[in-house]
Swiss-Prot record:
This is Probable inner membrane protein Smp. It comes from the Bacteria. Keywords: Cell inner membrane, Cell membrane, Membrane, Signal, Transmembrane, Transmembrane helix. The keyword RNA-binding does not apply. The signal sequence may not be cleaved. Disruption phenotype: No visible phenotype. The lineage of its organism: Bacteria, Pseudomonadati, Pseudomonadota, Gammaproteobacteria, Enterobacterales. It is a single-pass membrane protein. It is found in: Cell inner membrane. Belongs to the Smp family. The chain crosses the membrane at residues 164-184. It comes from Escherichia coli (strain K12). Induction: The nucleotide sequence of the putative signal may have a regulatory function; it may form a perfect stem-loop.
Length: 214
């Protein structure tokens, strides 16, 4: 009797631990889902930025085909590009690498690229360089600095989504427990005839009724 009782407790403990492990895995999966969604946004941002850079080079190219590039119009294009956007700074260089026009934050390129081991302003940024195409080769280059730093509000939104998913999983677990206890309360089914249960030797009411009819 004691051995059967011990087996029953071990069997029940294994089931409970297995269910808890599944619950933890589901909650971790919710966190992974939110983080993966955030990581997928960075390549999309880079792709959109490169498309924008190519469009800007098409607008700048006619202004650089003369011996003296139109610096004022190029500067106006760059100012519009960096005005209240995720583009921290933008610069146009000639084919020799000399700066023609620049707009945005006044941070040196050496500091922006962290060549000295220091990240300017603590930003997580990314550089994009797009050639300005001409008939006989590149007329110059356009350099953009993208701000890939996740804002506090965006990070908070990701955390809120993760917490909501976890809460939904816990609510699903609670609903399952309540339904199980409600539907099976006071009833014994055939699965309760398992040799691991203490009630295995007692007949199910359905069996009793069938025996009486016979």
């Amino acid at each position: 009797m004691a051995r059967t009782k011990l087996k029953f407790r071990l069997h029940r403990a294994v089931i409970v631990l297995f269910c808890l492990a599944l619950l933890v895995a589901l909650m971790q999966g919710a966190s992974w889902f939110s983080q993966n969604h955030q990581r997928q946004r960075n390549p999309q941002l880079e792709e959109l930025a490169r498309t924008l850079a190519r469009q800007v080079t098409l607008n700048v190219a006619p202004l650089m085909r003369t011996d003296s590039p139109d610096e004022k119009r190029i500067q106006a294009i760059l100012d519009q590009l960096t005005d209240e956007s995720r583009i921290l700074d933008a610069g146009v260089y000639d084919e020799q690498g000399d700066l023609i026009a620049r707009s945005g934050e006044s941070v040196e390129v050496r500091d922006r690229l962290a060549l000295d081991g220091k990240k300017a302003g603590g930003y997580f940024n990314q550089q994009i360089v797009e050639p300005i195409a001409g008939k006989n080769g590149p007329l110059g280059y356009l350099r953009l600095t993208l701000d890939t730093h996740t804002l506090a509000t965006e990070a908070q939104q990701v955390d809120n989504t993760t917490n909501i998913l976890r809460l939904m999983l816990l609510l699903s677990l609670a609903i399952g427990v309540v339904l199980t206890r409600t539907l099976l309360q006071g009833k014994r089914t055939r699965w309760q005839q398992s040799p691991f249960l203490l009630t295995a030797s007692k007949p199910v009411p359905e069996e009793e009724e069938s025996e009486k009819k016979e």
